[in-house]
C-alpha cells in the first residue's frame, strides 16, 4: 500500500508505532484475554495504566507537584464553560485575548456566565498579519483570570511568548500546541487540551491545573465540570473514555522514546521551515502571516489562482496527501504538521507543490 499522509487539523495523525502497538494489544491487553475497552476503569490494571500515563506526561512537561493533572471529557468546548464556572470566584469579569476563531469562541461562551472583556491583538502590516506582544495586552486589574489560545488552528497564527502576569490567573487553550515544544508550566495556572491533535484520539481532554485554584466553583457548576469533584475522584467521577486514555498514554511513551519535547520541538521547526520556505520562494503560493507568528502546527496557504483549489486537492489526494483543504472561514489550504507527521510527509507535500506549480503555474 502506498504511504498516506494525513494533514487533518483534528482528529489528526497518530504515530504509526502507537497504532501498531494498539493493534497488537487490541484483543488481549496485559494477557487479560480482553481489550482495554472491555475492562473496568476501576480495575488494578487500568488504574496502573492511568498512573503511568500521568507520570509520563509529568515527565514530558516537567509538571511540579503543585499541579494536578486531570483526564476529562467534553473537549475544549466543554472547558469554555468549565473555566468561568470554576475560576470566577465571585468576580464578574475575565480577560479573553482574541487572536482568532477559537479564542473568540471561548469568549462567546464565557458571556453566559460573566461579563468578559475581549482584547483583540491582531494587526495587519501591509499584507501580513501580526499579533501584539504580551506587554501591549490591555489587561484589566479586576479580571478573575486571563484566557488565551497560543495556537489558532484555523488562521495559522501562534503566540510563542510565555505569559508573565503578576497576581493573575493565566489560562491557556493548548489543544493544538501541547507537547509540540517545551514550555515552563510554572508560567500558567491552568492549561487544557483536547487530545485529538497532539495527544491521541478524540474523546479525552487533559487539564493541568495549579492546586491552589481548585475548589472555588460556582453553585451552578455541573459535577462533571467541577474541577474539585474531578480531582477528588481521580478523574473517575464517571466512567472515563478508557481507550482514549490508554492510547494517549502510548503517545506519551512514544514521545519520550523520540527524545522528549526538545527533540520534538526541533523536528517540528524543521518540518514547518521546509514548507514555509517552499511557499515563500514561490509566486504561486501565498502565506499571509508575519514570520514571527506563523504556526508550526498549522500551515495555512493559498493558491494565487483560487480556481485551481479543487484540482490541487484532487491531485494531492491521488498522491496520498490527504485533508489539505483549509477551513471554510479562511479558505485555501491548511497542512497540519502535528507531532505524528513525519518529515517525509512534509517532503512529499513540498515535492507535490513544486510539481503542481510547474504544471499549472
Swiss-Prot record:
Q: Which residues form a coiled coil?
A: none
The principal localisation class reads cytoplasm
- One GO CC term, this protein: cytoplasm
Q: Which residues bind pyridoxal 5'-phosphate?
A: 76-77, 102, 153, 173, 196, 238-239
Q: Tell me what reaction this enzyme catalyses.
A: O-phospho-L-serine + 2-oxoglutarate = 3-phosphooxypyruvate + L-glutamate; 4-(phosphooxy)-L-threonine + 2-oxoglutarate = (R)-3-hydroxy-2-oxo-4-phosphooxybutanoate + L-glutamate
Q: Which cofactor does it need?
A: pyridoxal 5'-phosphate
Where in the sequence is N6-(pyridoxal phosphate)lysine found? 197
This entry's Enzyme Commission designation comes to: 2.6.1.52
According to its UniProt record, where is this protein located?
Cytoplasm
One Gene Ontology BP term is:
pyridoxine biosynthetic process
Q: Where does this protein act, in terms of pathway?
A: Amino-acid biosynthesis; L-serine biosynthesis; L-serine from 3-phospho-D-glycerate: step 2/3; Cofactor biosynthesis; pyridoxine 5'-phosphate biosynthesis; pyridoxine 5'-phosphate from D-erythrose 4-phosphate: step 3/5
For binding L-glutamate, which residues are annotated in this chain's numbering? 42
* Keywords per UniProt: Amino-acid biosynthesis, Aminotransferase, Cytoplasm, Pyridoxal phosphate, Pyridoxine biosynthesis, Serine biosynthesis, Transferase
Which enzyme class, named as a word? transferase
> Matching InterPro entries, A to Z?
Aminotrans_V_dom (IPR000192), Aminotrans_V_PyrdxlP_BS (IPR020578), Pser_aminoTfrase (IPR022278), PyrdxlP-dep_Trfase (IPR015424), PyrdxlP-dep_Trfase_major (IPR015421), PyrdxlP-dep_Trfase_small (IPR015422)
Q: Which domain of life is it from?
A: Bacteria
What is this protein's function per UniProt? Catalyzes the reversible conversion of 3-phosphohydroxypyruvate to phosphoserine and of 3-hydroxy-2-oxo-4-phosphonooxybutanoate to phosphohydroxythreonine.
Instruction: State the family named in the UniProt similarity comment for this chain.
Output: Belongs to the class-V pyridoxal-phosphate-dependent aminotransferase family. SerC subfamily.
Q: How does it assemble?
A: Homodimer.
Name of the molecule in the record: Phosphoserine aminotransferase
